A protein has these predicted regions:
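Outer-membrane beta-barrel "beta-signal"
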Residues: 138-145, 149, 158-170
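Repeated loop/turn-to-beta-strand initiation elements of outer-membrane beta-barrel proteins
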Residues: 32-38, 102-106, 140-149
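Outer-membrane beta-barrel architecture
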Residues: 25-27, 93-95, 135-139, 165-167
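C-terminal hydrophobic structural anchor segments
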Residues: 97-131
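C-terminal outer-membrane beta-barrel translocator/porin domains of Gram-negative envelope proteins
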Residues: 1-101
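Transmembrane beta-barrel architecture of outer-membrane proteins
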Residues: 19-23, 87-91, 131-135, 144-146, ...
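Structured core elements
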Residues: 91-93, 107-109, 148
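Outer-membrane beta-barrel domain signature
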Residues: 43-56, 62, 110-118, 122-124, ...
Length: 170
C-alpha cells in the first residue's frame, strides 16, 4: 500500500489541487496439492486532484507483469499491452496452474476489474466500466528458465490474443 502527492511547486499542480495517488497491491498463492497451485491477486489505484493527469502518473492496465512498461501498470488477462485507464481502477486476478508432467504445466487464468473517472462512482454501473478477461496457457520449465505461451481474450479487446514468454521475471 502506498500514497503519493504530486505537485509542481510544493503546493499545487498546474495552478490546481495537487494530485494524490493511492495504490494497493496484494498477491498470494497456495498449493492444495503438490501438483496444483492457486495464485490470486488484487490491485487498486486511485488518482484524485485536478483531473488533468500527466502520462507518468495516469493509470495503466494490461500485460502479464505488474509495472513492466510503467511503474503504475496493473496486469490484466486478455489485454496484452499497457493501455490507459481512468482515475479509479480496481482489478482482481486468479490463476489455476496444474503440473501435468515433470516440467510441464497448464494454466487457466482470469481477471475482473472496474474503472471509473472517480472512486465513489466505481460501483455505479452507469458511471464505470466492467472489464473481464480469461486465458489458458502452457509452460515448460527448462534449464534456462520457463517457456510460456498463452491464449487470451477480454471484453476490452474483443478478440483472441496471445502472449509468449521466455526466462525468469526479475
Amino acid at each position: 500500500v502506498s500514497y503519493h502527492v504530486y505537485t509542481d511547486n510544493f503546493f499545487q499542480y498546474k495552478d490546481n489541487n495537487p494530485i494524490s495517488v493511492f495504490d494497493a497491491r496484494w498477491q498470494g498463492c497456495f498449493s492444495p496439492s503438490s501438483k496444483f497451485t492457486v495464485t490470486h491477486s488484487f490491485y487498486g489505484r486511485v488518482l484524485s486532484g485536478s483531473g488533468n493527469y500527466p502520462f507518468a502518473i495516469i493509470n495503466m492496465v494490461g500485460g502479464t507483469i505488474p509495472g513492466r512498461y510503467m511503474p503504475q501498470q496493473i496486469p490484466f488477462t486478455g489485454i496484452n499491452r499497457a493501455e490507459l485507464s481512468q482515475a479509479a481502477l480496481l482489478v482482481a486476478g486468479l490463476n489455476l496452474r496444474q503440473r501435468i508432467l515433470k516440467n510441464q504445466y497448464i494454466s487457466v487464468m482470469g481477471s475482473y476489474g472496474r474503472n471509473s473517472g472517480k472512486f465513489h462512482q466505481i460501483l455505479d454501473s452507469s458511471e464505470s466500466v466492467d472489464m473481464a478477461g480469461v486465458g489458458i496457457g502452457y509452460m515448460y520449465k527448462s534449464f534456462l528458465g520457463p517457456v510460456e505461451i498463452q491464449l487470451n481474450w477480454s471484453n476490452q479487446t474483443k478478440k483472441v490474443g496471445w502472449y509468449a514468454g521466455f526466462g525468469f521475471v526479475f
